[in-house]
Amino acid sequence: MQAALEVTARYCSRELDQYGQCVAAKPESWHRDCHHLKMSIARCTSSHPIIRQIRQACAEPFEAFEKCLRLNEAAVGNCAEHMRRFLQCAEQVQPPSSPTTGEAQPLPAS
């Protein structure tokens, strides 16, 4: 879960901040009034390579978790076991190695 939060915070901080502000401002109706912002976080994170890789590798537990959330909107705590299975799978996924990470590469010795 820490990895997912880090990716979300790093690449989707604007969306995450907007959603958090909406939830805080509308404690009675956040699930309805902030849904569009929740979806913007989902769109943002879905475009990140590690998230796409997790969704592919962990499709089955992810779909079960999403289904549980839809069925238990008012009691998401009922989905703890589904979440645990998904996160256990997600933690096993390694980020794709990319030669162009934007970090400086050492020069070859001459």
Swiss-Prot record:
UniProt KW Repeat keyword: no
Major place of residence: mitochondrion
Motif (Cx9C motif 3): 58-68
Full protein name: Coiled-coil-helix-coiled-coil-helix domain-containing protein 5
Extent of motif Cx9C motif 1: 12-22
Disulfide-bonded cysteines: C12-C44, C22-C34, C58-C89, C68-C79
A GO-annotated cellular component: mitochondrial intermembrane space
Keywords assigned by UniProt, alphabetized: Acetylation, Disulfide bond, Mitochondrion
Gene: Chchd5
Domain CHCH: 9-52, 55-97
Motif annotated as Cx9C motif 4, chain positions: 79-89
Renumbered ranges of motif Cx9C motif 2: 34-44
